[in-house]
Amino acid sequence: MWPAPAKLNLFLHVIGRRADGYHLLQTVFRFIDRADTLRFEPRSDGEIVLATPIPGVPTDSDLTVRAARLLQQASACRQGATIHLDKQLPMGGGLGGGSSDAATVLLALNHLWQTGLTRPQLEKLGLTLGADVPVFVHGHNTFAEGIGEAFTDIELPPQSYLVLHPAIHVPTAAIFGAPELKRDTPPIRHGEWQPGQGHNDLEAVACAKFPAVAEYLNWLKQHAPQAMMTGSGACVFAGFASRREAEAILAQCPADMNAWIADGLGEHPLAKIS
């Protein structure tokens, strides 16, 4: 089994916009121990088969299939694979699940097919699939800039996170495309950032467009003022120095709130695979 861990954005600032429409960001990616898992069966016919398709997602559009085919093309590999995906991370939750799945496909099949691509080469491939994919391939908690492709490793203290997931899908494009999105937060230098500093510029737009996000975030902030949204939503979270603190807040969650605790990781579980 090959893990594809979730990420949290410990802050997310939009500091500008390029002429081509891409937004310039600053953020810290933190891997957590909540994950999808993948399993691969080698095939000699060169076919890429997704044994566990996601309802509503055409197979050819699925990031796992696209990642596998991209690796085949880049490496001239004639082998194939049947992909089994155990999907635990919500789609449209801001946890990077699809990007993480794609990164794990690149890392796993590069290893299993023995294609010999380096991690920087896999990061370049990943960027063509999505802006977050290279960070998952890279394998370390990072301070990321640009459109997410420029990053610096960062050491983070151990923390436990209480994550609340409103049962909705927040489309990233709807948040970044909103005219009211704040796009001029002053940039900070990565060496000056400290845990707990910063905010998520996408939060106000997501809360206005999706009342469930606002409801969950407001509830969590009443119990943990440091709470914020991750990515473009829908999940919100709060970090704690100990798991016991997170469990105390979890115990107060209304029964109809989807909530869980995850621990921060020092690095991606596949950080040392080659």
Swiss-Prot record:
Catalysis performed (reactions): 4-CDP-2-C-methyl-D-erythritol + ATP = 4-CDP-2-C-methyl-D-erythritol 2-phosphate + ADP + H(+)
Pfam families: GHMP_kinases_C, GHMP_kinases_N
MF terms in GO: 4-(cytidine 5'-diphospho)-2-C-methyl-D-erythritol kinase activity; ATP binding
Ranges in a coiled coil: none
Keyword Transcription: no
Name of protein: 4-diphosphocytidyl-2-C-methyl-D-erythritol kinase
InterPro entries linked to this entry: GHMP_kinase_C_dom (IPR013750), GHMP_kinase_C_sf (IPR036554), GHMP_kinase_N_dom (IPR006204), IspE (IPR004424), Ribosomal_Su5_D2-typ_SF (IPR020568), Ribsml_uS5_D2-typ_fold_subgr (IPR014721)
Top-tier EC class: transferase
Positions annotated as active site in the UniProt record: K7, D132
Keywords assigned: ATP-binding, Isoprene biosynthesis, Kinase, Nucleotide-binding, Transferase
NCBIfam families in UniProt: ispE
Protein role: Catalyzes the phosphorylation of the position 2 hydroxy group of 4-diphosphocytidyl-2C-methyl-D-erythritol.
Family, similarity comment: Belongs to the GHMP kinase family. IspE subfamily.
Pathway(s) served: Isoprenoid biosynthesis; isopentenyl diphosphate biosynthesis via DXP pathway; isopentenyl diphosphate from 1-deoxy-D-xylulose 5-phosphate: step 3/6
Any one GO BP annotation for this protein: isopentenyl diphosphate biosynthetic process, methylerythritol 4-phosphate pathway
Residues that hold ATP according to the record: P90, M91, G92, G93, G94, L95, G96, G97, G98, S99, S100
EC number(s) per entry: 2.7.1.148
